[in-house]
Amino acid sequence: MKLYVISGLGADFKVLEKLKFPEHLEVVFLDWLLPERGETFHHYVERMAEKMDDSEPFGLLGYSFGGIMVQEIDKIKPAEKIVILGSIKSDREKSRFIKVGEITRIPKYLPENIFTEKSALAYSFIRRFFDPKNPKLMEYFTVRDPYYLKWSIEKIAEWKFKENPKVIQILADKDIVFPIKYSKPNYVIQN
């Protein structure tokens, strides 16, 4: 069975390099696409799903924003199994920080030019205080197109979704983007 995998916002698949997949799975990593100017989330999801063969059963695995994406793809091309890592199952699990972005619509009004290489480096530096075990953050963060980053943050803040019972959620107990206190994951990873 094929397992389609989508990593986190702006990340390539090095971020998932420690995962070991069963040999019976044919793992297919899907790269992020750059959104077109003014593109709706639904249209973007359709374009991401175009790369997938749904003529036979398949699974979906998404990390962080990739977890949101695979749940949306499942509406278009239903999967046998869906696993999300470090992600949320519904908009009810958004952190307060993300909810503030949703309510105020601040992400929509942020200028694109704040999503620069320097701001990515600053984020990486600050994140090390919260996640000292992850010194390779900038190695993973390879999609740095300012429009893509701004668009993605807007879509995360705007995302509305009712929980899908077939989604298996795995969260770290110290996740800073999607804190565990707002979710009831199926599995918890310590540290």
Model-derived segments and their meaning:
Residues 18, 72-73:
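Active-site signature of alpha/beta-hydrolase-fold catalytic machinery across serine-
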Residues 131-164:
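Hydrophobic, aromatic-rich cap/lid helix
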Residues 78-113, 149:
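Flexible "cap/lid" loop of the alpha/beta hydrolase fold
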Residues 59-60, 82:
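Conserved alpha/beta-hydrolase fold motif
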Residues 1-56, 90, 106-112:
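Active-site catalytic motif of lipid deacylating hydrolases and related acyltransferases
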Residues 61-70:
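Gly/Ala-rich beta-loop-alpha elbow adjacent to hydrolase catalytic centers
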Residues 30-32, 171, 182-191:
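Short glycine-rich catalytic loops that host catalytic nucleophiles or stabilize transition states
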Residues 169-171, 175:
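Short beta-strand/loop motif that positions the catalytic acidic residue
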